[in-house]
Regions:
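Extracellular/periplasm-exposed beta-strand and loop segments of Gram-negative cell-envelope proteins
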Residues: 38-54, 81-103, 135-179, 207-229
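Hydrophobic, well-structured mid-protein blocks that either form specific transmembrane helices
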Residues: 97-139, 143
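Short loop/turn motifs that connect adjacent beta-strands in outer-membrane beta-barrel proteins
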Residues: 20-25, 69-70, 114-124, 140, ...
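Short glycine/proline- and aromatic-enriched beta-strand/turn motifs that initiate or cap beta-hairpins
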Residues: 20-60
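Residues on the lipid-exposed face of transmembrane beta-strands in outer-membrane beta-barrel proteins
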Residues: 30-34, 57-65, 77-79, 105-111, ...
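Bacterial Sec-dependent N-terminal signal peptides
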Residues: 1-27, 228, 232-236
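Extended, basic/helix-rich recognition subdomains
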Residues: 189-212
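N-terminal hydrophobic signal/anchor transmembrane helix of membrane proteins
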Residues: 64-66, 70-73, 79-85
């Protein structure tokens, strides 16, 4: 009789343990952070000319699905500022600050290490790779040029100062608005059950040339960015 009672007790314990182990398939996530971008182009023929990194803001919402074991696929929508500084430090030095805003749709594939947050609590690490499509929504430029290279502006001393928003309807510089790129990164997080918290790093490399084919330049020019983010997620 004691063996029967013991078997029943063990059965209830096992059921209790299984009830506590929740298995999820989906995750919805919100994240925000800092972007650091630069224009990747050849300026070797221009003396003392540089493109420098400037910080911006990024935010995203997305969903992820646990395909099998530790493998997951995700997609979402992201806002990212790809800002950078152009400087010419020659005899007549000048600079331009570029504030570029994009809306992107990323698609990524990730693999969880240490713990699988869809099955268990604890610390996890997720390397991931993916691609993205993005749309160039707006560009704002601010800076100054030497007066002797431009006409039609009222200058302050020997320099012309300006602060303008680019008109994409005219698109005089023949900029592309639809672009593609690839990304790779890593996230480190902790699963509390239904809730995850994490920090991450991503490097984004632009596949698309920023100019249209009819543009007068033959130089390769792409925008590359590093994103550092913090995020929270809910699983179901």
């Amino acid at each position: 009789m004691r063996k029967v009672y013991l078997s029943i007790a063990l059965g209830f314990c096992c059921q209790g343990i299984l009830a506590q182990q929740s298995f999820y398939r989906w995750k919805v996530e919100a994240e925000a952070g800092v972007s650091c971008s630069v224009l990747d182009t050849d300026v070797s023929g221009l003396s003392e000319t540089y493109y420098k990194v400037r910080p911006g803001f990024t935010a995203a919402i997305g969903a992820e699905y646990n395909i099998v074991d530790q493998l997951a696929v995700g997609a979402g929508i992201r806002f990212v500022q790809r800002d950078y500084l152009y400087q010419n430090l020659g005899g007549d030095s000048w600079n331009t600050r570029y504030n570029n805003n994009f809306i992107s749709i990323p698609l990524h594939l990730g693999y969880y290490l240490l713990h699988n947050p869809y099955h268990e609590k604890g610390l996890w690490i997720k390397p991931q790779v993916g691609i993205y499509y993005e749309y160039f929504t707006s560009m704002h430029t601010k800076g100054m040029y030497p007066m002797n290279i431009m006409e039609g502006y009222k200058g302050d001393g020997s320099y012309i100062r300006y602060n303008t928003t680019y008109d994409f309807r005219k698109n005089e510089n023949h900029l592309r608005r639809s672009l593609f790129g690839g990304e790779a990164g890593i996230k480190i997080g902790y699963s509390f059950g239904k809730i995850d918290a994490s920090v991450g790093y991503q490097f984004q490399y632009g596949f698309s040339h920023i100019y249209q084919e009819k543009a007068s330049t033959s130089k390769t020019a792409r925008r590359n960015s590093s994103l550092i983010t913090a995020s929270a997620a809910y699983k179901f």
